[in-house]
Amino acid sequence: MLSPKRTRFRKQHRGRMKGISYRGNRISFGRYALRALEPAWITSRQIEAGRRAMTRYARRGGKIWVRIFPDKPVTVRPTETRMGSGKGSPEYWVSVVKPGRILYEMGGISEIVAREAISIAASKMPIRTQFVIAG
């Protein structure tokens, strides 16, 4: 699963997801892509599940690019813990995704195969997505 090798700070604020994505919203590498239509935190497990599903379906043919990286730590407090005594410990990593962001790209395969592979990956995502073709 994806996670940063090292970070400057162990914990982060939750932040807000306002507006649309202005970065990473164009197809750069492949010919087909999966675009997010809603804002969400996508965990490293979900990213990996989508990548595996696409790889399995496409088999040897084609190439896959993962265009998002989980760089935000999410902290969780132990269950049945009283309030106070600081912030919880980092549990998992998420990628902050805004509408319009490209999640995955594929190339070197036919459109039918790409559409099916990307739809399988889309079912693993916690948000509504859209299949897009470059050009």
From Swiss-Prot:
NCBIfam families: rplP_bact. This is Large ribosomal subunit protein uL16c. SUPFAM superfamilies: Ribosomal protein L16p/L10e. Pfam families: Ribosomal_L16. CDD domains: Ribosomal_L16_L10e. It is found in: Plastid, Chloroplast. The gene is rpl16. GO terms for biological process: mitochondrial translation.
